[in-house]
C-alpha cells in the first residue's frame, strides 16, 4: 500500500509505519546523544505510552536510564487494507529498538481507565519485574467510563464563567477568524474533571500499592500545561484547566498514600507542543505556531523528547529539582519567560491569512503535526509500497 496523509480537521486519519518507526529512532538517538541519566529509574510503568509526552517518557527511561518498561495504551493495529494508528506504529518501533538494545519492553493494549487493564498490568509487573520504581501517567482521552459505575463521561473544551471570543486558525482551510466558545455548565465542568482530572491516576497508584508492586522510594508523575495570558481563557481558566487542577489535588493525596514507602507524586508542567491532543484545542494551533517562531529564533525551542530528558535530569532525578510552590516540576520556564511571551503577544493581533507564513512558524507546526503520524520524515520513501499490518507482540 502507498500511504499518503489523509487529514480531516485537526486529525490525520491514517499513519505511516516506517515514518513512525523513524520518528521513534530519532528520539532515541537524541537521548543517547545526551548521555546516561544518573540514578534514574530501572523498572518503569508508563500509562499512555504510545504518543507525545508518554512515548518520550518511555524512550527517556529506556534509553537514558537502561530501564525495563511496561507501556499501556489504547491503539488500533493495521489491517491489510487500513493503516493502524500512529501510536501503534510508534510502539512497534519502540519494541524493535528496545529488543536490539537488549532492553525489556512489554506493552498492553486496552482501556487504561478500566479495572481489567490495571489488573493485567499488575500481573505483568509481578511476573516479570517484581516492583516498579517509576509510574508515568500520561493519558489524554476525550471520554472515560467509570470502572465502578459503568457510566460514560465526556470532556469538553470550554471556558468557565463566560463565553470567550478569540482569533482562531482553521488548520484545514488556513482561514483565520474570530471564534466564540460558549461557557461550560456545571455538569460539563464536572464531567471534564472526571475524564481528565486526577481520579484515574489515584486509582492506578492505589491498585499498584495494594498489589505490593511499588518499590521503596517509588516516584509517580502526571503531566499538565498551564500556559500564559493568550491561552488562559481556553486552557488554564477553562474546563481543561479545572481538570488539571484536580491533578494537583490527586498528587497531594497520592503523596500521602506513598509516604510509608518513601515515595513521591508530582505534577510536571510541560511546554506547549504539537501533539495529537493540543491540535484539537481551539486557539492552540495559532499560539503554538507563533511560539515556535519566537522560540526557534531565540534558540530555546524544544520538542517532546528534549522536554522529557530535561524533566528527568532537572526534575525527577536530581537533588535540586525545579519545583514551584505547588510542588510541581516546571519545565515550561523557557516558554513563560516574560520577554518571550511579550513577543508572542505582540505578534498575535497582527497575524492574518496573508502573512501567516511570515509572522508565524505555521510551516513548522504543520510539519510537526504530519510527523506525529509518520509523514514528512527524512529518509522515508513515501512512494514505496508498505504493509500496514505490522505485528506487535502484546501482553
Curated annotation (Swiss-Prot):
GO terms for molecular function: enoyl-[acyl-carrier-protein] reductase (NADH) activity; NAD binding; trans-2-enoyl-CoA reductase (NADH) activity. Keywords: Fatty acid biosynthesis, Fatty acid metabolism, Lipid biosynthesis, Lipid metabolism, NAD, Oxidoreductase. Belongs to the TER reductase family. It catalyses: a 2,3-saturated acyl-[ACP] + NAD(+) = a (2E)-enoyl-[ACP] + NADH + H(+). It comes from the Bacteria. This is Enoyl-[acyl-carrier-protein] reductase [NADH]. NAD(+) binds at residues 48-53, 74-75, 111-112, 139-140, 244, 273-275. The record marks 75 as: Plays an important role in discriminating NADH against NADPH. It comes from Saccharophagus degradans (strain 2-40 / ATCC 43961 / DSM 17024).
